Each structure stands twice: as structure tokens, then as C-alpha cells.
């Protein structure tokens, strides 16, 4: 089935979603399963870059949500001390053997979790971390210990998600775009990027930077305040701005801009020094 045919079938299924159950068969089930398989293999993405802009395939997000209706809850094996879990989404690695691992070409350290329909590209390293369904993690990216990649999040090439980083998931509301980290970004430990925000290519976020749609992102040099997007090549640290009543409120501060040449010659710690 072509992607245009899949899209039409998913849109029709979405309109009749209340009728979809684990007993559903035929074109509806086939379209949902084919879409989830395409996401899992990386041939389809929830969002794709076209020029400088990101286009969201809302129908692919709908397929992810519809997938929950096709399965009942069931025992998931593999827990500590022969324990189990109770869920309706399979592991990406279910029934994988040596051949599948070699073909996939990424490294998955014990106790990392990746749910089916998430794509992991070649050269990725997954420390004990969590990658949710519909996400896309591109080549040679490091997902460090306790980092979380939320549902449908898009992570670029050569990205470093440091320990404890949270990249937010966006399945609902349906019109919302996914959280996006573009190529060659460094996200410092325990930072959070959520609510469909975009960190543009080559940016560096220091430790403990939190960015949501309502977070002020302040360019220290120009005084410009922006929301929802970190410009390419930005070096960002946590800061604060004066507010009413003499109280300072949190913001993210762009302390400098760097190009790829500077990044290649300068350590992350040097970039973050004020």
C-alpha cells in the first residue's frame, strides 16, 4: 500500500476510531500495522524536514494512537528476577536475534527500553534509557543513561543527549508538532526540551536548561526574547529575568553563537564558560 493510500485509510480509521478494537481486521488493521512498521523501520517519520521547515505527518501520529486500540493488555516478559510488565505495546527488540542486531547496526546497552514503532539508526548508542513509540533517533547519536526520548520526538544525527535529559513526547493534542533536536546538538545533563519546541542545528544546551513553549529564550547580546525555538548554533544556559514584585523568573539565555568550525575546535565546557 502506498503512503497516500495508507494516509487515506488511517484518516478514515481515525474518524471511526471508537469502533476499532482488538477484533478489528481487514484494511483498517492492515493500514495501522503497516504504518507502525514503516515508522519502526524509519522509512516513514512523524515529522520530516523540508528545506528549513519541519512538516508533520499528522496521519502517522494518528496511526500511533490507533495502534493502542488494536491490542489488549498482556504480560510482557523480561523483568528482573523473572518479573513481568503489563502493557499493550511490544518492545522494538521482541524476537530479535543476532542477525537482526547486526543488521540494525546500533548498540543497545542492557536495560535500555525502546518501544515498537520507534526508529533507531545505525551508529546510535543507547545507554539504559527510554525511547517511546513513534520517535526517530538518527545516526551516531548518544542517548545517555536515564535520558528519555518522548513519543514521536525527532532526534538528529550526531546528537548527544546527556544523562537524565528529557525530550518531551507529543501525541495529543493532535495538531501539536513533535519536539525536535536537529543535527549536531549537545543537550546537557538533566535538561528538558518539551511541548514541541525545536533546538536548531549545532546548538549547545548547558546542564539543567528547561525549555517549553512558554519559556523565554533571551539573546544576551541583542536582548531579543523568543519562544519555542533555539536558533542554530546557539550556546544556551539557565538564567533568570526580573518580573513583577521584584521576583526573578526562570529563562534560558543564549550567551553566544558558534559555527561548525568553532564547535569542532572548542570543547563543550569552553563554550559554556561565560
Curated annotation (Swiss-Prot):
This is 2,3,4,5-tetrahydropyridine-2,6-dicarboxylate N-succinyltransferase. GO terms for biological process: diaminopimelate biosynthetic process; lysine biosynthetic process via diaminopimelate. Substrate binds at residues 107, 144. It is found in: Cytoplasm. Belongs to the transferase hexapeptide repeat family. Pathway: Amino-acid biosynthesis; L-lysine biosynthesis via DAP pathway; LL-2,6-diaminopimelate from (S)-tetrahydrodipicolinate (succinylase route): step 1/3. InterPro entries: DapD_Trfase_Hexpep_rpt_fam, Hexapep, Hexapep_transf_CS, THP_succinylTrfase_dom1, THP_succinylTrfase_N_sf, Trimer_LpxA-like_sf. Its EC number is 2.3.1.117. Coiled coil: none annotated. It comes from the Bacteria. Pfam families: Hexapep_2 (PF14602), THDPS_N_2 (PF14805). It catalyses: (S)-2,3,4,5-tetrahydrodipicolinate + succinyl-CoA + H2O = (S)-2-succinylamino-6-oxoheptanedioate + CoA. Homotrimer. It is an enzyme of class 2 (transferase). Keywords: Acyltransferase, Amino-acid biosynthesis, Cytoplasm, Diaminopimelate biosynthesis, Lysine biosynthesis, Repeat, Transferase. The keyword Metal-binding does not apply. SUPFAM superfamilies: Trimeric LpxA-like enzymes (SSF51161). GO terms for molecular function: 2,3,4,5-tetrahydropyridine-2,6-dicarboxylate N-succinyltransferase activity; nucleotidyltransferase activity. The keyword Transcription does not apply. The gene is dapD. CDD domains: LbH_THP_succinylT. One of its GO terms (cellular component) is cytoplasm.
